[in-house]
């Protein structure tokens, strides 16, 4: 099993649907990978419809690991101060091939790509620009000559 760092570059959003009657939204993104959730900052400019984050979110990722769901669930939320946050929509980013390539080559990258955001009715509510990379961590364990705590020496 290989261990590495999965990094998501959350760049921007475009045409996000308003969830408030007042027309302004304060969008942020929650990204879940294998039960671990990371949150972006809240974008405040442009009334929230075309936000820019430029955030980097990271996970420790094992491949192959437990379970078969090698995907990122990306949820766009509207931050509300006096009530619970509103769900705007979500997208799924599949990363299995990225992890496979990263394990094979040491590093792999999905260049920034547009992902459609859909709401609970599967209606289009905007898009996100997201890049993803995976970098294998160096093996800090055996050096090839150590076994069970003993290091073999050569006898002449």
Curated annotation (Swiss-Prot):
What the entry lists under InterPro entries is as follows: C2_dom (IPR000008), C2_domain_sf (IPR035892)
Query: What positions does the entry give for Ca(2+) 3 binding?
Result: 80, 83, 86
Enumerate the cofactors the protein uses.
Ca(2+)
Arranged from A to Z, the UniProt key words for this protein are: Calcium, Metal-binding, Plant defense, RNA-binding, Transport
Q: Which GO terms describe its molecular function?
A: metal ion binding; RNA binding
Q: What positions does the domain C2 occupy?
A: 1-108
The lineage's top-level taxon is: Eukaryota
What disulfide bonds does the UniProt entry report for this chain?
Answer: none
Question: What does the record say about how the cofactor binds?
Answer: Binds 3 Ca(2+) ions per C2 domain.
State what induces this protein.
Regulated by ARR2.
Q: Alphabetically, which GO biological process terms does the record hold?
A: defense response
**Residues engaged in binding Ca(2+) 2:** 20, 78, 80, 86
| Signal sequence residues | none
Please explain the role this protein plays, according to its UniProt record. Binds to both sense and antisense RNA. Can also bind sheared DNA and dodecamer DNA with a low affinity. Interacts with mesophyll plasmodesmata to mediate its own cell-to-cell transport and potentiate RNA trafficking. May play a role in plant defense signaling.
Q: What is this protein called?
A: 16 kDa phloem protein 1
């Amino acid at each position: 099993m290989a261990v590495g760092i999965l990094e998501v570059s959350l760049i921007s959003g475009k045409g996000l649907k308003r969830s408030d009657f007042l027309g302004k939204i304060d969008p942020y993104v929650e990204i879940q990978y294998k039960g671990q959730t990371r949150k972006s900052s809240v974008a405040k400019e442009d009334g929230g419809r075309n936000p820019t984050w430029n955030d980097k979110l990271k996970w420790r990722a094992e491949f192959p690991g437990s379970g078969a769901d090698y995907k990122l669930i990306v949820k766009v939320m509207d931050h509300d101060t006096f009530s619970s946050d509103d769900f705007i929509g979500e997208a799924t980013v599949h990363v299995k091939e990225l992890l496979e390539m990263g394990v094979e080559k040491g590093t792999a990258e999905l260049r920034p790509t547009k992902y459609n955001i859909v709401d609970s009715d599967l209606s289009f509510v905007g898009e996100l620009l997201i890049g993803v990379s995976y970098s294998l961590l160096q093996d800090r364990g055996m050096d090839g000559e150590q076994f069970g705590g003993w290091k073999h020496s050569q006898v002449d």
